[in-house]
Amino acid sequence: MRGLLYLALAIVSEVFGSTMLKLSEGFTQAWPIAGVIVGFLSAFTFLSFSLKTIDLSSAYATWSGVGTALTAIVGFLLFGETISLKGVFGLTLVIAGVVVLNQSKAHAEDKKQTACE
């Protein structure tokens, strides 16, 4: 359970860092630059903590997939960026891929545990 908390914090930190990257205007604004550094440093720190209990493939796929989707939503909501129907479809596929990967890992773990009993 702690691994999932760290993974969620890694995702939020990465989205924060990406948002600050946009606000830094090409690394010309001091406070957003500090936000980029804090955001990405926190993201990788929390991701590394999550890897103590979550498989690398699941953690990284979830981090990158959910982070990508949330960053697109932040871009839409905060910066007025557009998301085309194809873009929505692509983000849906990314999220579906993360879900399928995590379900297959859970299924494999269940089989492994049943075999040991």
UniProtKB/Swiss-Prot annotation:
GO MF terms listed in the record are:
transmembrane transporter activity
Gene3D superfamilies listed in its UniProt record:
1.10.3730.20
Which UniProt keywords are listed?
A: Cell membrane, Membrane, Transmembrane, Transmembrane helix, Transport
- Enumerate the subcellular locations listed in this protein's record, separating them with semicolons: Cell membrane
Q: What is the lineage of its organism?
A: Bacteria, Bacillati, Bacillota, Bacilli, Bacillales
Tell me where the transmembrane regions lie: 3-23, 31-51, 59-79, 81-101
* GO term, biological process aspect, one: transmembrane transport
Q: Which InterPro entries match?
A: Small_drug/metabolite_transptr, Small_multidrug_res
Q: What is this protein called?
A: Multidrug resistance protein EbrB
Q: Which domain of life is it from?
A: Bacteria
The entry describes its oligomerization and partners as: The efflux pump is composed of EbrA and EbrB.
Q: Which family does it belong to?
A: Belongs to the drug/metabolite transporter (DMT) superfamily. Small multidrug resistance (SMR) (TC 2.A.7.1) family. EbrA/EbrB subfamily.
Task: State the protein's purpose.
Answer: Part of a multidrug efflux pump. Confers resistance to cationic lipophilic dyes such as ethidium bromide, acriflavine, pyronine Y and safranin O. The efflux is probably coupled to an influx of protons.
